[in-house]
Amino acid sequence: MLDTNMKTQLRAYLEKLTKPVELIATLDDSAKSAEIKELLAEIAELSDKVTFKEDNTLPVRKPSFLITNPGSQQGPRFAGSPLGHEFTSLVLALLWTGGHPSKEAQSLLEQIRDIDGDFEFETYYSLSCHNCPDVVQALNLMAVLNPRIKHTAIDGGTFQNEITERNVMGVPAVFVNGKEFGQGRMTLTEIVAKVDTGAEKRAAEALNKRDAYDVLIVGSGPAGAAAAVYSARKGIRTGLMGERFGGQVLDTVDIENYISVPKTEGQKLAGALKAHVSDYDVDVIDSQSASKLVPAATEGGLHQIETASGAVLKARSIIIATGAKWRNMNVPGEDQYRTKGVTYCPHCDGPLFKGKRVAVIGGGNSGVEAAIDLAGIVEHVTLLEFAPEMKADQVLQDKVRSLKNVDIILNAQTTEVKGDGSKVVGLEYRDRVSGDIHSVALAGIFVQIGLLPNTHWLEGALERNRMGEIIIDAKCETSVKGVFAAGDCTTVPYKQIIIATGEGAKASLSAFDYLIRTKIA
């Protein structure tokens, strides 16, 4: 199961264990059970602190295994294979169960230990999903820390019957005590806040006590991270606030055009950005979104950022780097069937539609790449492009046209998502040449029609263009003195990671120049 290199790395990690770990497998006669048994036996051979045993009498999913301590039943459970992107989740679960501390803030760990109530979480994942590990790891950690919290991470490919019964059409999909809890990427802080209902109020009260910053950066993607590093290096009081560190990068799989880094993955780059920021004196505020900008009443005064949690943060200068999100089709049925067949991540959710018919909306690079990827998994792909021709690179167009199970429809305006009340069953589109309406029967719709800037919260506060992008000049200055902007949320052309980081650095330098030239009001 594990090659020599993986065994060497895992053996080194297991040396960090400070207390014994027991792997308890519940298996059947399936090939997947044999695979898991082999994997667990290999892991146990790598450390004298790890033991493996079978107990096939337990009333749990088969195949599955519990990671616990001898004499205990507390800890995370994996149902199915924890390989692919989830192998890291397995390694971390072993470390945490074996006494190696988590790197999360101590205050957050104590909050988890103090959660009152019984919670049984179930998370469905796919081995190709790059968004799933964050959720699986967060809930695994909670199960290690609090005996009243249980978590089972379930491989959707192994338990396809449950995927069908529960209408899971997007991963990660989380259930708690048998009811839907959430879908898509969630941070540990976000999950804890949903479980601990008083957490948001306490967080807002704590934020309100923060002193004013010299520069407050709103958005923790590449632009925000670069701005934070450049600002902190100037020795000024720097705050960095965001919903999730890494931003849109977290939803990117392969990155091959970030100069000096020939190839990496979105999660790895986001982790590197976070590690770089942590090297400096930056007050990082996670899982917080801005709801309003209140510009300073006088030049040199304090600007205010109101958060969705009800807090108010103040700063002499602001850098807005809130990035962008996937653009919606804005047609009937899209909202109703979101995560029930309407999805935005082919890498995460593609395996859930194995052997089914799907559509991809959009003929740009993202859409054509999605169609190519999906063609190897699903029965058939229908690619719909609004314009008379696709806008993807020619090499991608040539590739997708060579695939026998992909149909391309141009001049197609999607008009409605069709469903049966619980899941997608098809879509309708209008031929923009003839005006005729056509129906396509399918199970999934992958929307790939570009990005929308995350600037809705700035309505009336500063100038934006008709696309919602913040209008900036060559120095990243906005229409409000002391407020700067950088990255995908601005009018800067070409939405690229490397451009966003450069713009973040530029915005930071401009903000510093503003601070040293402006008297404090």
Swiss-Prot record:
Q: Name which cysteines form disulfide bonds.
A: C345-C348
A GO molecular-function descriptor: NADH-dependent peroxiredoxin activity
PROSITE patterns listed in its UniProt record: GLUTAREDOXIN_2 (PS51354), PYRIDINE_REDOX_2 (PS00573)
Keyword list, A-Z: Disulfide bond, FAD, Flavoprotein, NAD, NADP, Oxidoreductase, Redox-active center
Names of the cofactor(s) = FAD
Is Acyltransferase among this UniProt entry's keywords?
A: no
- From the UniProt record, list the coiled-coil ranges: none
Q: What is its EC number?
A: 1.8.1.-
Residues covered by the Glutaredoxin domain: 109-208
Please indicate if the UniProt record lists Ribosomal protein as a keyword: no
Annotated gene: ahpF
What is written in the cofactor note of this entry? Binds 1 FAD per subunit.
A cellular component term, taken from the record's GO annotations: cytosol
Q: Where does NAD(+) bind?
A: 357-371
Q: State where FAD binds.
A: 214-229, 478-488
> Which protein family is it in?
Belongs to the class-II pyridine nucleotide-disulfide oxidoreductase family.
Q: Which PANTHER family match?
A: THIOREDOXIN REDUCTASE 1-RELATED-RELATED
Q: What else is known?
A: The active site is a redox-active disulfide bond.
Protein task: Serves to protect the cell against DNA damage by alkyl hydroperoxides. It can use either NADH or NADPH as electron donor for direct reduction of redox dyes or of alkyl hydroperoxides when combined with the AhpC protein.
Quaternary arrangement and interactors, per the entry? Homodimer.
Gene Ontology biological process terms in this record? cell redox homeostasis; response to reactive oxygen species
Q: Which organism is it from?
A: Salmonella typhimurium (strain LT2 / SGSC1412 / ATCC 700720)
Q: What is this protein called?
A: Alkyl hydroperoxide reductase subunit F
